[in-house]
Amino acid sequence: MNEFQEDILTGIPNYLPKHPGQDPLVSHAPKRKDVLNKREKQLALKNALRYFDVEHHADLAGEFALELKTFGRIYMYRYRPKYKMFARPLNSYPANCDQAASIMLMIQNNLDPDVAQHPHELITYGGNGSVFQNWAQYLLTMKYLAEMNSEQTLHIHSGHPQGLFPSSNQAPRVVVTNGMMIPNHSKPIDLEKYSAMGVTQYGQMTAGSYMYIGPQGIVHGTTITLMNAARKFTDGKLEGKLFVTAGLGGMSGAQPKAASIAGMVSITAEINKTAALKRQSQGWVDEIHYEVNTAISSALESQAKKGNKSIAFVP
């Protein structure tokens, strides 16, 4: 058994691991709104500390309170794993059934820095599409999956693993719920509040369900939308047309590729340099320009040649 497998089986360690600090090489989530009152902040800390032995509460309480004040959430950065986060072959995972190993692979793919939008805040895409609320939930879930057999089901509620329950080999291995709010009796600020308190999370469509596949999942529909729009509002000829848009995130990153497939030139504005570089490295956008005039010149040059170059502009 290697160190990675041992760490998975350990789950939450019974000692305080060294704090890894903030990695400047990855994109981090922006600070969330400060929406909790004093009593709610105390409850948020209580909810966070429930994952740890009482002997560590004195050390962790102040640290988690500072995270809540600084980031608007308690991510438990101290418990971020030391090992690299990426989807490994199934036989690399310490699991009792292939289904559990497959889910472990999917979780790690969603948190891979080459895939996720804000990997250290456990956000895959969309700015708030969370896999888990904190790293303790990740560690516990991976441990449960390693212990699971083919006649058990793991219940997870907004990132919190409730435990393994007896089921059957025909039942789901994992049942997940996310963002459980009552629409007629809640507002966006309520979701913000309960997320900060650690009792709910928004999992988007494929972040909290561990099945994110990146911009490829939406590029087909985006291409068709662009083609239909161009045909409706132009003479129908797409070659050399210019599409100007914004956003190179996990979903919006499909836009420049869709424009190229449709035969159009595109300029996509993006404020996050890390996101733009990631999309370029993955082949979703051809060029990145940091001056608006050079971006426009490149687009006009491609238009003149009836090309389909995709250009990112990062101010």
Give the positions of each predicted feature.
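Conserved residues at beta->alpha junctions
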Residues: 270, 314-315
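Flexible, glycine/charged-enriched surface loops at secondary-structure junctions
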Residues: 151-156, 236-238, 306-313
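Long, compositionally biased, glycine/small-hydrophobic-enriched stretches that function as flexible linkers
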Residues: 1-213, 314
